[in-house]
């Protein structure tokens, strides 16, 4: 008996109890006898039932949950013809559904049973590979549209029917993206959707219980939220589909549903290459052929995706996307991933879609959604050869067969080959023979010489190698092809210390440093001996180290550089992927050497988080950093690769994005591509982009439990994050904390509208706590930012958040002078524009309130004395750039005093929160001279620049007392003019 036969019999026996219940006229003995007699006859239903559950644990679970299916399938096997007419059958079932609980149950039961049928047909080759993923797509589309229509009618009855300006009813249109849009859905895939509606307007409340109309945007947002819950929420019956909305304009930061015109405006003004790539698959679900709005939507999106000219610019964009995927594979340690790995499904998709983007504007036949329909079209255009066409088509079908069998085993979204022996047997069985369509759309039986796992793995690798070869020929990659040169360090890993010493003597290393260098090399080799490094890793290391050491000893500061680089190499020595990255990318290795030579901070980051090495592949990008205004969009795209409901992965990804961006900024700083003011701009706007995502993530977590405060409109949050200190002053450094205050605009006695109702104030406090938790939790990727909340009203004794009205009252009536000083450097970094305006009004009101100038001077001087006593611990021969007299803190206090002293007469002076522009305003208002203004600014920039570079070197902000003598003298003299004379 084969392993599969034994598994079939075992699985059938496990259904014995259900069979007894389904056939009361049969005893357990007779059922066992029937199994024994029929389980070796592939044409009989009993065998087919056993085979289907042997191939899929998911099918077995469905049969256990719905016992009536066991009887049906025992007597008559499902056939592919049963897997049709989904929308008609669904609508018939939903006609008797009267509440959302029943809707959820009906959708999930229908989905599970139909998916089990498709798995049955797939396992028994009752349908081709292509037919399976088309039918999976049609099932998903039917479930989405049936749920939408049911919820739409419910919403219309509750709050009215949305109308356009001409009085015509409006519908929610849904774009199915990705594989759903291309009729290529996986067995257990997420669905990527975008919601839209034709035009602005409001609901008609005739024949409803609604008291007033709402605008169409609010109606469709509510409908969209309910639809997502109906599909995505996990109940006792499971879920329908994991639903991902992040491909919509502005991603998680954007409104859930846009009108046609707003969507058109977005893609015209802000659409990016990756969004063009995604929109190739965009298809209107449930589209009626005569619906003019469907035609309008398609016509609107077509020019964005398909350009009228031949567009070769996309090749580099797609190459970069592919590079990001490869870095992601390395980051997550993905092995044997048939989707993202070399020669995987994604590379076939890239090849096809690059031609669609380049030539689709001129070649109408390329404007289709299905990959298998596009492949012959690009062959006819001679964009690929006949051989490349055959290789890609055959490999793609094989890979998709593997993917769907894998996912059908347990209804899990995986593309990684199994290590479990039973699952390996299943894949071997499924891939040796299966049905598919040939190039003429005729059903054929495909046979492969696969009898065991080794055969399967070899066949899979052959397919992937063919895909990779075509991908490299057509699109190429970013690797530098320069070869490694031999050097005097060729045998370093095997050499004894006498040979190494001789090599050092022959090199540029000073004789006085030989012993020190030898000791460091000995420690490194000893460290390698205590690490688990496979034979492949040893081989890569033996080729890499000669180049590394040769480059190190070319540098003047090799004594400090050597331990930094050796530390990185030792940390990644057991991770062959990163060793190969440095070996195969000489420019990246050179970049590591150059940056670590000038920055202890960068070397420590690379040693702690080797994933950052990927960021050094594009050396040109380091000299031309991304504009800081693009950080929100870049972060959004970075997070798209993750499941939207996996908080742990998102929290880690935020930290990785921050570290990667910090590295790029530091590199650009070292390479002279960024002046100090721009460094702080980049670090500040990076923090703001992260704050936005953190707030949205926290909001999602808290609102999923409690709902949202009922007074909020549409996509509002009623929540402000105020940045104080260096964040507020747009002056963040490499190691800066975030000084934050949380404010909210709550209505008294209002509650949330979720399943668990709480007071709105309590909701915002929980939101604030969640935000701080996301920032401060220490994961394997470190802490995101240290969030300092002590500047909130009443400091540590106060609540973690407070209402705008309470904040205003506190600042006007109870705040100390030092709190008003802090308010000078405060500005909103997250929130709706209307709330930001309210805060700015409060800030101006507080800062421009009349005050006793002598008392103000006394308070500022006293606070400076306290800070000096508390923070300054430098020796007489040292100068602390931040805290000592004549340093950064004095300049900040001068700016704060000037604003507090002069704003009562000139409220316009409160406009800025950063020191440089405050001084500019003071000079323009003739409060200080232009010469003093320029000198203060120059001193400030020079001190900050030095602090930045000390941070990069891993040093504190303390320098020798002989430095900055002129600057300190000026600052102290200016201080005395303000506060002493």
UniProtKB/Swiss-Prot annotation:
InterPro entries: GlnE, GlnE_rpt_dom, NT_sf, PII_UdlTrfase/GS_AdlTrfase
Alphabetized GO MF terms: [glutamate-ammonia-ligase] adenylyltransferase activity; [glutamine synthetase]-adenylyl-L-tyrosine phosphorylase activity; ATP binding; magnesium ion binding
Annotated keywords: ATP-binding, Magnesium, Multifunctional enzyme, Nucleotide-binding, Nucleotidyltransferase, Transferase
Function: Involved in the regulation of glutamine synthetase GlnA, a key enzyme in the process to assimilate ammonia. When cellular nitrogen levels are high, the C-terminal adenylyl transferase (AT) inactivates GlnA by covalent transfer of an adenylyl group from ATP to specific tyrosine residue of GlnA, thus reducing its activity. Conversely, when nitrogen levels are low, the N-terminal adenylyl removase (AR) activates GlnA by removing the adenylyl group by phosphorolysis, increasing its activity.
Gene3D superfamilies xref list: 1.20.120.1510, Beta Polymerase, domain 2, Glutamine synthase adenylyltransferase GlnE, Nucleotidyltransferases domain 2
Reaction(s) this enzyme catalyzes, per UniProt: [glutamine synthetase]-O(4)-(5'-adenylyl)-L-tyrosine + phosphate = [glutamine synthetase]-L-tyrosine + ADP; [glutamine synthetase]-L-tyrosine + ATP = [glutamine synthetase]-O(4)-(5'-adenylyl)-L-tyrosine + diphosphate
Region feature (Adenylyl transferase): 483-981
Pfam families: GlnD_UR_UTase (PF08335), GlnE (PF03710)
Similarity remark: Belongs to the GlnE family.
Region (Adenylyl removase) residue spans: 1-479
Cofactor(s) for this UniProt protein: Mg(2+)
Record EC number: 2.7.7.89, 2.7.7.42
Name assigned to this protein: Bifunctional glutamine synthetase adenylyltransferase/adenylyl-removing enzyme
Source species of the chain: Haemophilus influenzae (strain ATCC 51907 / DSM 11121 / KW20 / Rd)
Any single Gene Ontology cellular-component annotation: cytosol
BP GO terms, sorted: regulation of glutamine family amino acid metabolic process
